[in-house]
């Protein structure tokens, strides 16, 4: 029954006192969904805004790759507002993300799944799941992931509703990476090259992609004055 599934998942997410946080979500989610790892990506417009949490180093890399390259399961799930399933990244007949797939495979990722986070008409991002072996999610795992995405979206909205305008709720920041360094670096490049911040972000992404680096690492070099674009 749907209600039983919801109660079971909420109970697993709870800390025993009726509350839970993003860190516990990404800790418990892989066990519930039967996968190796999970991550929650929040979006800003049609672009990745940052990760709310990740369950392990590989999940963190998946989020970083999507943020750097602008493609991947979370981005498609959000933009298309539907579940995205790629059960075998190594299958040459079904290459969906030409930039994302090679480094993901090198990290040991064989299957990825994206579930949109939304409450009514409000879209927030996507829940990302990955496996180190090929194959689709089972029917029960898929149903559990849908509930996880729904519960996560509602929790994010409810938590942020209690924060002041323009301020991220502290409960959302605990395990998050909102890539503040990238925004700082974009500001620096904007001043150095006399361009808009938007154009600076585009150049940072292009440099990261062209040099096979993560955007966060490039940003840190710009901030430390080890790198100047232009």
Protein language model annotation of sequence segments:
Residues 89, 126-135, 140:
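Short beta-strand-to-loop transition segments that serve as allosteric relay/switch motifs
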Residues 161-229:
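Signal-transducing coiled-coil/dimerization helices and immediately adjacent hinge/linker segments
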Residues 111-118:
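Short hydrophobic beta-strand micro-motif common in sensory/regulatory domains
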Residues 142-153:
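Allosteric cytosolic regulatory segments
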Residues 43, 59-96, 105-110:
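Regulatory sensory and allosteric helical modules in signal-transduction proteins
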Residues 101, 114, 126:
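Short hydrophobic/aromatic beta-strand element in the GNAT-like acyltransferase core
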Residues 1-69, 221-230:
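Intrinsically disordered, low-complexity terminal regulatory regions
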């Amino acid at each position: 029954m749907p209600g039983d599934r919801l109660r079971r998942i909420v109970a697993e997410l709870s800390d025993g006192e009726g509350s839970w946080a993003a860190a516990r979500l990404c800790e418990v989610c892989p066990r519930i969904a039967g996968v190796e790892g999970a991550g929650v990506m929040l979006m800003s417009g049609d672009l990745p805004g940052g990760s709310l949490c990740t369950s392990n180093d590989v999940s963190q890399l998946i989020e970083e790759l999507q943020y750097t390259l602008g493609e991947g399961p979370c981005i498609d799930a959000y933009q298309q507002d539907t579940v995205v399933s790629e059960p075998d990244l190594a299958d040459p007949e079904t290459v969906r993300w030409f930039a994302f797939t090679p480094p993901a495979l090198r990290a040991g990722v064989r299957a990825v799944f994206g579930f949109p986070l939304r409450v009514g008409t409000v879209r927030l991002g996507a829940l990302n799941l990955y496996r180190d072996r090929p194959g689709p999610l089972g029917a029960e795992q898929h149903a559990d992931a849908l509930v996880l995405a729904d519960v996560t979206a509602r929790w994010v909205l409810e938590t942020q509703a209690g924060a002041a305008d323009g301020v991220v709720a502290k409960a959302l920041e605990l395990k998050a990476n909102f890539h503040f360094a990238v925004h700082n670096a974009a500001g620096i490049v904007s001043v150095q090259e006399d361009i808009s911040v938007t154009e600076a972000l585009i150049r940072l992404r292009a440099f990261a992609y062209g040099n096979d680096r993560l955007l966060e690492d490039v940003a840190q070099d710009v901030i430390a004055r080890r790198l100047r674009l232009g």
